[in-house]
Amino acid sequence: HTVIDIGGQDVKVLQIDNGVMTNFVMNDKCAAGTGRFLDVMARVLEVKVEDLGTLGSQSTKYVGISSTCTVFAESEVISQLSMETNKCDIINGIHHSVANRVAGLAHRVGVRDQVVMTGGVAQNIGIVNALQEQLGHTIHTSPLTQYNGALGAALFAHQKYLKEQKG
């Protein structure tokens, strides 16, 4: 399985074989491709971050956002707005920019047939769709995907507790 976890501060891609992590890569050096990146873009566009997915899906094309740096991407978005570019097209471009960044990380560990996406960003259908397009794989998410990490930690702790009780 391939697990893609996009949170507020970092992006992680894991390769899982028979329940064991066999490969891992993480982008934690900058905000590009993270929930924080989307927060900044939503603020510049004057929309709610939770509306980005819906708005991006109303686009007929996407405006290329070439900068991976949040600060430079913010400047690109401001420039597009000053040219009166359709906000939905800009948002679609943002989704593709994030997907391109995440796909680059995913290709470093190798993408398997079963792809699962977790973290709050997985609630953004625009990013999920753009990433599916980039990877050529269906991406599975859950409605409460932002809690997957906490649930996994709780299960791990419970299993450890049970083992310790057996002595």
Language model: regions and residue ranges:
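Active-site nucleophile and cofactor-binding loops and adjacent substrate-binding regions
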Residues: 4-8, 25-33, 91-95, 116-121, ...
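Internal, active-site/partner-interface "lid" segment
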Residues: 47-79, 166-167
